[in-house]
Regions:
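Interfacial "coupling" helices/loops that link adjacent transmembrane helices in transporter permeases
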Residues: 20, 271-315, 668-710
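A cross-kingdom feature of multi-pass membrane systems that activates on extracytoplasmic/periplasmic
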Residues: 201-202, 210-258, 620-651
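Short helix-loop junctions at transmembrane helix boundaries
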Residues: 48, 252, 323-360, 646-653, ...
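Hydrophobic, regular-secondary-structure patches
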Residues: 30-106, 443-511
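Selective transmembrane-helix segments that form parts of the transport pathway or gating/packing helices
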Residues: 307-324, 397-403, 704-718
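Short beta-strand boundary microenvironments
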Residues: 96-152, 164-175, 192, 199, ...
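N-terminal membrane-entry
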Residues: 250-267, 356, 647-664
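Feature of multi-pass inner-membrane transport and sensor proteins
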Residues: 1-26, 285-302, 329-359, 367-452, ...
Length: 784
């Protein structure tokens, strides 16, 4: 065969595509959807990374590591390192806001830093670094003082002295300052040292390091440790920024990387299965066409190349369309999140183009189509010239003995199962498509659970406002809780007592953190129990208590804790609590038990939940009441904005995940509908013969339903079996190890999966059956 003839065969590709436009429509749609899915997922991930990078730079600063406990000489050498872009010393006073530093009447934290701090924290708006006697102040100071650049503000020191500082600029990141109803003053190190010396306040100096772009962050950190003998304990990482650069050595972040890689891989596999199955079905129903080409003299290699290039010809329109659809959907989702969800999405790019998403989507389409066409191409090349006369070759559809025994006299059911299982590859592709969709559903359902555990403001006990005495001692009068509860704006007010106690447990001695709960807090804690029960009345001189799961806390139900003159028994374990984890086990008891053990009956902290978190007047009223009652010796925390942002993030996350799962479910349904439709088209003559020899409409429906049902059942069995294993592993990795909650079979998810699969079967059967029944039997017979 000459090269000229080969070219003439390949010239049939655009002609065939034009003639078979309707038949190829579903295959092209599958490619479009697969490319769209991957493009949208990776583009959205890229946009989210850009947003989080911007947010973290503004909130936590543009630094990679912070080093402490080093000499000035070592600090100077670090600043001169080739891979270091920005280096700044940093010291603070009253970061805990427990000392009496006031700017006006608001508590103040003081920061002393080098000029380079402006490069570390982009939110600081100042043309030049503060000079002696000047400060950068958090912008929330403008809420109660008429302050502009150049205005002098008074700073009251703990010894009662007042000094005047000039405002040189503002720090627009006020989230932490607003939460604690305070301001942060940033000054140069000379001014800072003078103030510290004046009040005889000691401080520690730390050093922020920002590495140059395209630096191997992990290697640079290791080099610093080795060269200067700095231990890991002296180096703190900016975890979020390092994670966004895929450079974090945090075990939990590394686990999230692995989870993301697995889920991304399954998304890609879902697209591969869909494209491969569609091309395989398309080629199967055109066997007679390839047989005709063999009659005209085409060789096997020519037919093989024809099939591959024909598949790539579909990509000419399908890949750009899929990428465009993915980009537009990303724009729409970003615009929705930015406009309607919350301020935390304000830095999300609305019309951003993601090269990563486009490259991944295009590569998936082209590479998958090329390799997916390989097997059908070999199959088409095997078509003998006689196929052109006998029609499309269909795998042996004869009923196997096992099918006959299974369905007895129901020959149509046996035939349907045989049609599904006669092509092992097609069965594998359909089963894989179903199974992957189920795997994705069960995997992403774990992420939804993880968000609920990870975000504390979503919990029932999350306060809107909190107040604690500056010393952190139990000095808040319980009467104050009653006064707050009596306010019409307050939904709940509740307090907690706290006391560290020496104890002996599990054969070792060590401190415990004893904390009290009232009735309403125990009610909330009930749903967080992962073992045991809530504490009841003391028995035999033993006080029942709860503990909180933590990897460093080995206490479990039944353990006893011996105090100096009392014994506690752990009767329950919680997976979560409002408290930050410490090296000491958290032990929770009733207020009465706390009083009997410590003799104290006042609170260390009072939390407040409001009926309307948007009522600024109510918040101001409560703030005034607390400040007047406690003579301003309190740390007042306003968590409303932070809670609102996290709740918005929670719902946005759910929205994105559910939208993704809906797309996956839709693609799965489309895939089986397409495959059943193509299978019916390939066997159209066979169905005509069956109708001619007496098969009625009901039997025909049952036969095609049996074929679709076989795909569904095999997909359900494989998908649920593998999905439950993966669901359990992800749950243990993300939740059990960190929150203590035990894995349980997700019956709700399984029920949804079964319903979706049954819906796919019903939709897959409807159109092919209607098409067959509309075709006259004589039309089929006349073609034989």
């Amino acid at each position: 065969m000459s090269s000229t003839e080969m070219k003439s065969y390949l010239s049939l590709i655009p002609i065939s595509a034009k003639v078979r436009r309707r038949q190829n429509r579903m295959t092209i749609l599958c490619i479009v959807l697969a490319v769209f899915l991957v493009t949208a997922v990776f583009s959205m991930a890229d946009m989210a990374i850009r947003m989080e990078t911007s947010n973290q730079l503004n909130k936590n600063g543009n630094w990679h590591i912070m080093v402490k406990d080093i000499s000035p000489e070592t600090a100077a050498e670090l600043a001169a390192q080739e891979d270091v872009a920005v280096f700044s010393a940093y010291s603070d006073i009253n970061a805990s806001l427990t000392e009496n530093y006031f700017a006006g009447d608001k508590r103040a934290a003081l920061v002393g830093a080098d000029d380079a701090i402006l490069q570390i924290f982009p939110g600081m708006q100042c043309s030049t670094a503060p000079a002696d006697g000047e400060v950068l102040v958090t912008a929330n100071i403008r809420d109660w003082l008429d302050v502009t650049v150049g205005t002098a503000i008074p700073l009251t020191l703990p010894d009662g002295q007042t000094i005047s500082l000039t405002v040189a600029g503002f720090n627009e990141d006020t989230s932490d300052a607003n939460q604690y109803d305070a301001v942060v003053l940033v000054m140069n190190r000379s001014t800072f040292s003078q103030i510290a010396a004046q009040v005889e306040e000691s401080f520690e100096t730390q050093y922020f390091i920002q590495f140059k772009p395209r630096t191997n962050l992990r290697q640079s950190i290791v080099n610093i440790e080795n060269k200067y003998g700095i231990s890991e304990e002296k180096i703190s990482e900016n975890t979020y920024l390092m994670a966004l650069n895929a450079s974090s050595n945090n075990d939990y972040i590394a686990g999230l990387y692995a989870v993301a890689a697995v889920l991304a891989g399954m998304v890609v596999l879902a697209g591969i299965f869909m494209i491969t199955g569609s091309i395989n079905s398309n080629v199967a129903q055109r066997t007679s066409y390839y047989g005709m080409l063999r009659c005209l003299g085409a060789g096997k290699n020519q037919v093989r190349m024809l099939v591959r290039l024909e598949a790539l010809f579909w990509c000419k329109t399908a890949v750009p369309a899929g990428c465009l659809l993915g980009i537009v959907s990303t724009w729409g989702l970003c615009s929705f999140l930015r406009r309607f969800i919350g301020e935390e999405f304000s830095s999300l790019p609305v019309l951003g183009i993601s090269p990563v998403g486009i490259i991944c989507g295009s590569a998936l389409g082209l590479i998958t189509v090329w390799f997916a066409a390989s097997s059908p191409a070999r199959r088409a090349a095997k078509a003998s010239p006689i196929t052109a006369a006998t029609g499309n070759a269909v795998e042996n559809a004869a009923d196997s003995p096992c099918h006959a025994r299974l369905f007895g006299s129901r020959a149509e059911l046996s035939l349907g199962v045989s049609h599904a299982t006669s092509s092992k590859k097609n069965l594998l592709l359909m089963t894989g498509s179903f199974a992957l969709s189920i795997l994705l559903f069960l995997s992403f359902s774990v992420l939804l659970r993880w968000v609920g555990f990870a975000l504390n403001p979503l919990q029932s006990y999350a306060p809107d406002l909190s107040v604690a005495e500056t010393s952190g001692q139990n000095v808040l009068d319980p009467v104050l809780v009653e006064q707050l509860e009596a306010l019409p704006e307050v939904k709940h007010a509740f307090g907690r007592m706290y006391c560290p106690l020496p104890a002996e447990y599990q054969g070792k001695q060590g401190p415990i953190d004893l904390i009290s709960y009232d009735t309403i807090q125990f009610g909330w804690a009930k749903k967080d129990l992962i073992g045991g029960t809530l504490p009841q009345e003391p028995e035999d001189g033993t006080y029942p208590v709860l503990t909180v799961f933590d990897k460093s806390n080995s206490l479990t139900v039944g353990d006893t804790i011996q105090l100096e003159d009392a014994k506690l028994t752990v009767v329950g374990v919680l997976n979560d609590s409002p408290f930050s984890s410490t090296d000491s086990p958290i032990v929770i008891c009733t207020e009465e038990t706390f009083h009997q053990l410590t003799g104290q009956n006042r609170y260390a902290v009072i939390d407040i939940q409001l009926k309307d978190t948007t009522a600024d007047a109510a918040i101001a009223k409560i703030h005034t009441l607390l400040s007047d009652t406690l003579n301003k010796q309190v740390v007042f925390s306003n968590r409303i904005e932070g809670n609102r942002m996290i709740q918005s993030t929670y719902w946005a996350f759910h929205l994105v995940v559910y939208a993704f799962l809906i797309v996956i479910a839709g693609i799965t349904i489309l895939n089986i509908v397409n495959s059943i439709s193509m299978s019916v088209s390939a066997r159209m003559k066979q169905y005509g013969i069956l109708r001619a020899i007496g098969m009625d409409d009901a039997q025909l429906k049952r036969m095609i339903s049996a074929e679709a049902g076989t795909y569904a059942v095999s997909g359900l069995v494989v998908g649920i079996a593998l999905g439950l294993v993966l669901n359990r592993k992800l749950y243990i990795l993300l939740i059990t190890h960190y929150f203590g909650a035990a894995w349980q079979v997700p019956w709700g998810c399984l029920a949804v999966i079964v319903v979706v699969v049954l819906a796919a079967v019903v939709l897959a059967v409807y159109n092919p059956v209607r098409r067959i029944l509309m075709q006259p039997i004589t039309a089929t017979i006349s073609e034989l």
